Amino acid sequence: MRTDLNLPAQFGAVKDDDEQLLWVGKPNFTVFMLTGVPFLIIGLLWGAFDFFFATKMFSGDSNAPLFFAVPFLLLHSAPCWLGIANMVRLFLVHGNTFYAVTTKRLMLRSGFWGTDFKTVDYDKIADMEVNVGPVENSLCVGTIRAFSGNTTSKGGRIYDSFIGIQQPYEVFKKIKGISVDVKTDWNYPNAIRPETNPGYGTKYEKKAE
């Protein structure tokens, strides 16, 4: 596991002064790239259909004008180009992708030309799950997904994911434990709480391992 000492310097731009980083990880390259394979397969199948269509269009039996046929095929085969471009994007983004667990929130860092950050406060997390597929299991990694209420226009859930990280079950338990502690502090900030944790005004203390 990574610590503050080897944390990418760019995380300092969004970390609060009183915020501690408890875990930082990076996605496994193979698993990260595999996230783009479904879109790539669809694009290649679409491209294969367009290639077959193009061979018929440009054969001697066809009278289709080139000024119409070429732009049409280029536009129609967009899913193929987008699938390939997405794989290139994932390759370039991987080196700039890191995940962090802090005393206040989850942090996700990525970006190609620039650096993008996304944070998820613990009180917003409604559901979490950890997935370890066959490929991930063979690489000793897994993916943690957190749902914070965001949905698509059709009502599908939008997850924030820690993709292909090492020790996924340990990190999952760590996030769940911190989330329960922080939510309890926010929901019941009063002096009647145990002396070791009188309210959210206190600083979250990392338990000794």
Q: What residue ranges belong to the model's regions?
A:
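Short, charged cytosolic
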Residues: 1-25
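Short secondary-structure boundary/capping segments
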Residues: 12-14, 91, 98, 136
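Envelope-exposed proteins and targeting segments
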Residues: 19, 97, 102-104, 124-126, ...
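Short, mixed charged/polar active-site loops
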Residues: 20, 115-117, 155-160
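Flexible glycine-/small-residue-rich
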Residues: 25-27, 103, 110, 124, ...
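Alpha-helical transmembrane spans
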Residues: 30-96
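Conserved beta-hairpin
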Residues: 82-129
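A membrane-cytosol interface segment of integral membrane proteins
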Residues: 136-209
